[in-house]
């Protein structure tokens, strides 16, 4: 019998039957927390880059945990600058982290600014030690060739856009993590 729109009711029952079958087949499939965070990211370029970094970390036997609670595209800072900062901070964390550990990347809105931080397990650093790492040509790597410009470039970016450098030590599950980040308009 047709409904008031002229459609036959049994097609709806058939569609519901198909939906139930599909739901039954996919019931055990879930979406990971990182995938959920990537899908919620307002910048598909940043989400794509983060996906690549997650895969890079997995190859190095590391885990990256994302917590994205800010809109990159709603800031004064261009997406390309965010991509550079995220890439530098994650590359440094991946290189410095012991195998099997977790790196945390977080973004959140702070008033008119977006705070981005990357945390990785490491011995505690003093404020002086943190800030010295942002000097031009300063590196912790054995080979100095072509190194020592990442954090310096982040410092220059914060100066260009009137942002701030964020550094601190943080205890996560009784382990020290060093936190590097930016607060950008």
Model regions and ranges:
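Short beta-to-alpha transition helix within the HATPase_c
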Residues: 38-60
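Short conserved segment of the HATPase_c
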Residues: 125-137
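Conserved short strand/loop->alpha-helix "switch" segment adjacent to the catalytic nucleotide/phosphoryl-transfer site
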Residues: 38, 64-85
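Conserved ATP-binding N-box helix of the HATPase_c
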Residues: 3-6, 79-103, 160
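Glycine-rich acidic phosphate-binding loop
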Residues: 93, 119-124
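Conserved glycine-/histidine-rich ATP-lid loop and adjacent helix of the Bergerat-fold HATPase_c
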Residues: 153-165
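Short beta-strand/loop element within the Bergerat-fold HATPase_c
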Residues: 100-112
């Amino acid at each position: 019998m047709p409904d008031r729109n002229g459609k036959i009711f049994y097609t709806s029952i058939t569609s519901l039957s198909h939906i139930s079958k599909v739901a039954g087949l996919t019931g055990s499939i879930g979406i990971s927390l990182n995938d959920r965070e990537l899908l919620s990211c307002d910048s598909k370029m940043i989400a794509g880059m983060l996906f690549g970094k997650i895969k890079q970390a997995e190859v190095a036997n590391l885990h990256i945990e994302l917590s994205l609670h800010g809109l990159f595209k709603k800031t004064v800072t261009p997406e390309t600058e965010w991509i550079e900062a995220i890439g530098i901070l994650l590359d440094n964390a991946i290189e410095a982290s012991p195998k099997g550990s977790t790196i945390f990347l977080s973004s959140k809105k702070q008033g008119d600014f977006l705070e981005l931080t990357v945390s990785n397990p490491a011995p505690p650093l003093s404020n002086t030690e943190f800030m010295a790492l942002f000097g031009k040509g300063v590196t912790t790597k054995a080979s100095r060739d072509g190194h020592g410009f990442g954090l310096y470039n982040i410092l220059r970016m914060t100066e260009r856009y009137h942002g701030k450098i964020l550094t601190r030590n943080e205890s996560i599950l009784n382990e020290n993590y060093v936190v590097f980040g930016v607060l950008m308009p």
